[in-house]
Amino acid sequence: MRPVVRVIREDWADAALPLPSYETAGAAGADLRANLPPESRAEGLVLAPLGRVLVPTGLRIEIPEGFEVQIRPRSGLALKHGISLPNSPGTIDSDYRGPLGVILVNLGAEPFRVAHGDRIAQMVVAPVVQAGFELVEGLGATARGAGGFGSTGTA
């Protein structure tokens, strides 16, 4: 069964902007748009190089139990402008009901303007498995062992 994420708009949000949507039939992520407060819509938000900003979407969501929403960067913004998410993927738990915002970071050399209505991120709805944790005396051996970063080679 396809999960349904329930959505409400903030009182101040621009109802003319579309809800999150998938651009293609095979898309994994639904696009999220910047829904700026009325006083910021004309000028947008300017993100300085190495700066961070919390961009409002004007939405609150109810995620079905057993699922999460992952907020991920848009590849075009990352490649063309250096715009990404510092906590990628950002996790939204099913019991969160607060405002949905997207933290953007500008890793580029130039200021970047976020305009009202811009597609700023993708949200992926994913199932969650909550594991149990057990304290043990030792861990099973593997071929890799404790080899960490780069231990499996570079090619």
UniProtKB/Swiss-Prot annotation:
InterPro entries: dUTPase (IPR008181), dUTPase-like (IPR029054), dUTPase-like_sf (IPR036157), dUTPase_trimeric (IPR033704). PANTHER family: DEOXYURIDINE 5'-TRIPHOSPHATE NUCLEOTIDOHYDROLASE (PTHR11241:SF0). CDD domains: trimeric_dUTPase. Pathway: Pyrimidine metabolism; dUMP biosynthesis; dUMP from dCTP (dUTP route): step 2/2. This is Deoxyuridine 5'-triphosphate nucleotidohydrolase. This enzyme is involved in nucleotide metabolism: it produces dUMP, the immediate precursor of thymidine nucleotides and it decreases the intracellular concentration of dUTP so that uracil cannot be incorporated into DNA. Substrate binds at R74, S75, G76, N87, T91, I92, D93. Keywords: Hydrolase, Magnesium, Metal-binding, Nucleotide metabolism. One of its GO terms (biological process) is dUMP biosynthetic process. The keyword Metal-binding applies. Belongs to the dUTPase family. The gene is dut. The keyword Magnesium applies. One of its GO terms (molecular function) is magnesium ion binding. Its EC number is 3.6.1.23.
